[in-house]
């Protein structure tokens, strides 16, 4: 760049910083920019690896969607529990008015410190979310769910009134306001969404999510969660086998998948994942129904192997470290919680 251009650029940058504040524009190579992405674990080893950075990125919008009873709220509560373990502050905006505090507690959530709001309208819910984000003191906000964010005009109107596009406009306006503040305050905002069917679709998937297209664009990560099977102990169903596909990922390669078990009243089975992924990466040997690690049997059947790892956490950690290494993914440990560390 010649001297005249360099001087003109320096003057423009100085004017921008004077008008909009220091840090409003800078070079990507400047030391002030944090190169590492701060993340929080999802509570699932396989999903952390599938996300490519070791968890969900902070300072971003995340959308988790799927059919009913697929594990959307369970996954979000696991992320809340992981953030609280780091000393972070969590808020849950329960637009569905369906949060069970006892279930949340079983998943490891400190319900005594969890901020909860059960708003009357969609505008109120999103305004509360925006105020919490702008405060800079909340590390994670979960909105459950986009489908339940009913516009005020719809609530005040009559049954059967045509309210075309109201919901989509509400989401679009809210996300325009939220996004910049989310980045500045490094807050992770998770929107839970439901699936609807488009009528008359001949080709492609007829499934779509509620709330228009704005969330699809603003979300840095979109997760599609599905229940693919039941886990039984005898005739009793004790959990569900769950598959999560990373449909969109702005921080790592997308389209990776993770399969894990969600046990009722317990949440994501970390030990079950370690057993399955240990076998997949040849760290755990499987012969018939028996599982063995370093030549020693750890259990007959997956349930017994899971219980063994629960009773021997040091062995579980050793296998987990081997899995992370074998996955050869640049997994960032979710300890870079600047605000949480200051708390």
UniProtKB/Swiss-Prot annotation:
Intracellular or extracellular location(s): Cytoplasm
Binding site for ATP: 66-73
Alphabetized UniProt keyword annotations: ATP-binding, Cytoplasm, DNA damage, DNA recombination, DNA repair, DNA-binding, Nucleotide-binding, SOS response
GO CC terms of this entry: cytosol
InterPro entries membership: AAA+_ATPase (IPR003593), DNA_recomb/repair_RecA (IPR013765), DNA_recomb/repair_RecA_CS (IPR020584), P-loop_NTPase (IPR027417), RecA-like_C (IPR049261), RecA-like_N (IPR049428), RecA_ATP-bd (IPR020588), RecA_C_sf (IPR023400)
GO molecular function annotations of the record: ATP binding; ATP hydrolysis activity; ATP-dependent DNA damage sensor activity; damaged DNA binding; single-stranded DNA binding
GO terms under biological process: DNA recombination; DNA repair; SOS response
Family stated for the protein in its record: Belongs to the RecA family.
Listed HAMAP family: RecA (MF_00268)
PANTHER family: MITOCHONDRIAL DNA REPAIR PROTEIN RECA HOMOLOG-RELATED, RECA
Function of the protein: Can catalyze the hydrolysis of ATP in the presence of single-stranded DNA, the ATP-dependent uptake of single-stranded DNA by duplex DNA, and the ATP-dependent hybridization of homologous single-stranded DNAs. It interacts with LexA causing its activation and leading to its autocatalytic cleavage.
Protein name: Protein RecA
Gene that this sequence comes from: recA
């Amino acid at each position: 760049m010649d001297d005249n251009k360099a001087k003109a650029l320096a003057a423009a940058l100085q004017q921008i910083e004077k008008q909009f504040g220091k840090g409003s524009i800078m070079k990507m190579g400047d030391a002030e920019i944090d190169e590492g992405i701060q993340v929080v674990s999802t509570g699932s080893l396989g999903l952390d690896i599938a996300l490519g950075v070791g968890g969900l990125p902070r300072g971003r919008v995340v959308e988790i969607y799927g059919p009913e009873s697929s594990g959307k709220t369970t996954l979000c509560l696991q992320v809340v529990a992981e953030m609280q373990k780091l000393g972070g502050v969590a808020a849950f905006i329960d637009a569905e008015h369906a949060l069970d505090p006892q279930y949340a507690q079983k998943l490891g959530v400190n319900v005594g410190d969890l901020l909860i709001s059960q708003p009357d309208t969609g505008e109120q819910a999103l305004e509360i979310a925006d105020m919490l984000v702008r405060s800079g003191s909340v590390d994670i906000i979960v909105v459950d769910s986009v489908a339940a964010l009913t516009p005020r005009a719809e609530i005040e109107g009559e049954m059967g009134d045509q309210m075309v596009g109201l919901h989509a406009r509400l989401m679009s306006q809210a996300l325009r306001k939220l996004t910049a503040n989310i980045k500045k305050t490094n807050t992770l905002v998770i929107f839970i969404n439901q699936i609807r069917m488009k009528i008359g679709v001949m080709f492609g998937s007829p499934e779509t999510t509620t709330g228009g297209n704005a969330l699809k664009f603003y979300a840095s990560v979109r997760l599609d969660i599905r229940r693919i099977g039941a886990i039984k102990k005898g005739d009793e169903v004790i959990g569900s086998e769950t598959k999560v596909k990373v449909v969109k990922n702005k921080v790592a390669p997308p389209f990776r998948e993770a399969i894990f078990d969600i046990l009722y009243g317990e949440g994501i089975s970390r030990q079950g994942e370690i057993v399955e992924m240990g076998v997949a990466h040849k760290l755990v040997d499987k012969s018939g129904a028996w599982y063995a690690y370093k030549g020693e049997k750890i259990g007959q059947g997956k349930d017994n192997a899971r219980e063994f790892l629960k009773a021997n956490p040091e062995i579980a950690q050793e296998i987990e470290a081997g899995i992370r290494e074998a996955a050869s993914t640049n997994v960032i440990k979710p300890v870079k919680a600047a605000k949480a560390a200051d708390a």
